[in-house]
Structures are given as C-alpha cells and as structure tokens.
C-alpha cells in the first residue's frame, strides 16, 4: 500500500476523466484505482492544482488516499529507456490522443529516424491500443483533416470512440475529431434547455450534436458539415445512438444552409471552427431565430492576444451585421501548439435596437 494524492470523481464520469488524465500522463499506473460507493479514486502520477484540473475540464476533489500496488506491464517510457538516449527521452511528448483503439502521437523531427521503435514501444505498453499513428501534418483545408503515418500495429484508421454514453464511428484520416473537447461537449450539453433548437454549423461526425440530443430528449438539433466523409459518419452515428428523431444531418456549406434550410430556426448555435469561425458570423446570425439566441463561438488565440480584446472584435463584427451582443462567459479550452490556445466564447446575440 502507498499513500499519495488521488482524484475522487463520480463513477459515471470516470471513463471520460481517465481518458483526459491518461492522455496527459497524469495517472499513476503503478497503483490500482479505488472504487468506493458511487466514486472512483484515481491515483495521480504528480501533484496537480485544482485550477489545472479545471482547465482540463475536470471537476473533482483532490484527496490523500492509501492505494494498492498494481502488477503491470512496463509503461511507454520504461520500454524506451533501453532504446533511446537520455536526451531523446527528454523530448518525447508526454501527451497523446487516444481515439478508440488508435493512439496518436506527434513526435518532433529530431526523433524521426526512431519513430518506428517509439511506436512499437507504445503499442507494447497499452493493451487496448491496436495501432499507433504519428501526426505528420497539421489540420488544414476545408475539411480540417491532418496527415498521419502508421508507426506500429495494423488494421486501418477507422475506429469506434465512446464518450459521455455515446458511441462514434470515424476514420481519423478522413475527418476532423479530437477527444480533447470532451469536457467542452458535455458542458455545452448541460446548458441546453428543454425544447430548444440547436444548430451545429460545423458538426463533423456529430459529437456535440449527438451528446446534446442524448442528454436532452426534447431538443431538436440540426447538424451540418461540408466534408462528405464526415457527413456519412454523422448519419451513421445518429443511427448508432438512436437519435434519428432528434438530430437531422445536412451536407453543405454553413453559409448556404443558414440562408436556406436553417434560416431563423435556432435558439443556440455551435461554431466549433476555431481556425476561421469569425468569417461565419453571418451564418450564425441567419440561423438564429429572429429574436436572437446564444452562440458558442470557438477561436484560436496566440498567447499574447487578450481574450477581452478578441471579444470586442467579435462584438464589432456582430454589430456590423445588425446585432448586439452580451458576453456570458469565456474560457481557455486547450493548448493546440506552443503559445497558441483554443478559446470558447458563450455569447448572447440579439437584433440591434435602432
């Protein structure tokens, strides 16, 4: 037995919290997770402040606990110690993404000639991982798709991913998806009120739309995406999660759809297109009901850009579209690159009173 700090979280959130913590190397795998009534107590590999957990979207108690030692296989870094130099080990990324049975690394160029060995080491250390990918190109283009190469494993890049009681089928090489928005998705779903109409303008394979529909049976969600591969997975995921009566999928550009099929229908608009969401503010205005509503706007900000200044720019853009706004909340969601962050703004938008 060993006494250390752990996170106490309700069981229904345990799977999601574990995924977030493991992706950042924060779980002490040498100790067993404890189960106590309706809670899990997860041993931490290092001290973490409550504020840091909140930034990751984890609301939980920090507790000192007596944990039982686990018999386990060597972890990723232990497998690499006999293969890589101490200098190489220092630049191995400590965080990675797990999407279903796929692990996604982003290795620095300095490790390029050893990438296969690194991939094999990771595959050996994770019993539920089928294939290890290295991200070779950033998200780009109209479809927001990155470039990947297989480091280890086999079986292709299509997988099933589970989150907040929902299941999603996707091919990570053909569609945009990140598990790092898990906390943001359930946060938005918890804000949706009974009977609301939600327009998800950049829905991808449907995580925001489907989680909202599963958690709120009386809502109506219109989900659209311009990527035909994402659209096909969206259709399939709607069926897999049995929300056909609540979610309707559209294939097409948000600007065109908001001026036609989705015009004046939404109480709440989701705009998860942080690289260029601001050029679609007119689409949000068009999709909102005539008396206005709420917009969840996602943007990328460099570290030296003030979020209040960014909101003022957004406010001015809406003003030019004939709208007045009120900032309800804003938050830094995640780091996407050194000194570059993904931010979310919850904005009330109404027609201007002249």
Predicted features along the sequence, with ranges:
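SAM-dependent transferase fold signal centered on methyltransferase-like domains
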Residues: 1-354
